[in-house]
């Protein structure tokens, strides 16, 4: 019995010893690191060294420096155990000198696997980890060196583009100023041409209406002539009967007729109905009929009258008789002139005008309405016309119209008594008419002086001046069609040029309002598009305009230019075409340093939201270059790490 008890006691003692040894081994494997700040990033070291009491980052508790990395989790967020695996949410920082740092979950510490290239995560000695950071960092250092070289070259290009941007902006501003000045001058010229064109069109319209009126009156006169033809023939027959009866009775018909014909005709013309007094029935309805169908008796009277006048001239030796004979002869000549003129112009004058014309010639009274018969010149009138200048007031009273009869007269030369207008007057008036409108351009440019190589604007100014001088709207001849067409053509061309200038001004003003970056480094982007072919799509990004996705002849608008974002790190395009049952398309282009402008890596990370990368010298910043150089210098100055051997 005693032997059994002793053996049981020995067995329990052995088990306890084994458990103690096992616990000791476990305790030894999870022992805290020798470096209390192991696993802490350089940025967080200050947080842990600031005071003797450290607060958990979530603010739940506080712990002392002795509790830091003691292999017991005091903070739920793992703040107190960055270098051990005690807290499941803790993070371990691999320094990896000579290569890139890495952050691990604390659960990987002392797990028998070398996660850090420097082997710092397996510090308990159970696993021997070689330090491979230097070899592993060699490729990273080479990439860093290449990146620094790219920044160096890109920075040179960027500086050049900035200088070019300054020159370009100055050029744009100078061009805008010049165009505004040219616009002001050209607008004045266009306004002058427009005024002259409108004046010509008004005159042409008046001429058209006048021509229609004359054609209408001509038709009415022809109709009246046909209606009065029968009455005129009847009157002729009556006159022949009267003459025959006078001869049969033995009466001196010629002398009586000479004495009474003049007064009878005056009476007939005066008795002709005016505009307010309609002609009585049975009487001739048109003077044109009388002028066209001349009474043979009247012709006989005129001939006999001329014979008696010539005989009286030869039989009367006194001055008084000669004067009377001369006066009668002149009167007869005047009557013949009137008859001839009426015969020639019967188709061009209305019946009222013919009546007033004949009556005024007989009575010596001047008709209220001037007719073309008034244009028949006399010898005295010709002499006075040659020496009498036309005043500006008279020119203004002339509305510039002339009937078709006048035009035919000047062409046929039937009434060549008209003397040509004085050229000196015409030149003087042209000069006055061109000065009737004075634009601001007259203050800036002298039309009389041209350089050996005149600019387009000077050529236009000279052409417009010549046109305005050549086209005289107050002349007494109809508007010259060729000159009118010339005015219209020059107006159209000048207006087109003005529209182009105004469009260019608007474009320049919009351009100068764009955001080209703090140093205008993105000035070269204006008006440029960058393309990238990816699969079946071609992506096109146009700065300050739009971005599109093209497939064959199909085009999808990804967005309109919006702005730069995040300190000019992104270009934003918004309000693209709407996705079916989704949002409007949009695009964000990330800008990075490169030696040329190149669009790449277009993707659609979210539905209808596109992303792309654009390399450009504009993003090769000097501050970023210095940062890269410091990083490389730090890596190169590190000693080559030694192998992490087991202790």
UniProtKB/Swiss-Prot annotation:
UniProt pathway: Glycan metabolism; N-glycan metabolism
Disruption phenotype: No visible phenotype under normal growth conditions, but mutant plants have compromised defense response induced by the bacterial elicitor elongation factor Tu (EF-Tu).
Coiled coil: 155-235
Cross-referenced Pfam families: PRKCSH-like (PF12999), PRKCSH_1 (PF13015)
Residue ranges annotated for the MRH domain, each copy included: 527-622
Disulfide bonds: 529-542, 579-608, 593-620
Leader sequence residues: 1-30
Tissue expression per record: Expressed in roots, rosette leaves, leaf blades, mature stems, cauline leaves, flower buds, flowers and siliques.
Biased segments, Acidic residues type: 395-410
Subunit architecture: Heterodimer of a catalytic alpha subunit (PSL5) and a beta subunit (PSL4).
Name of the protein: Glucosidase 2 subunit beta
Organism expressing this protein natively: Arabidopsis thaliana
High-level lineage: Eukaryota, Viridiplantae, Streptophyta, Embryophyta, Tracheophyta
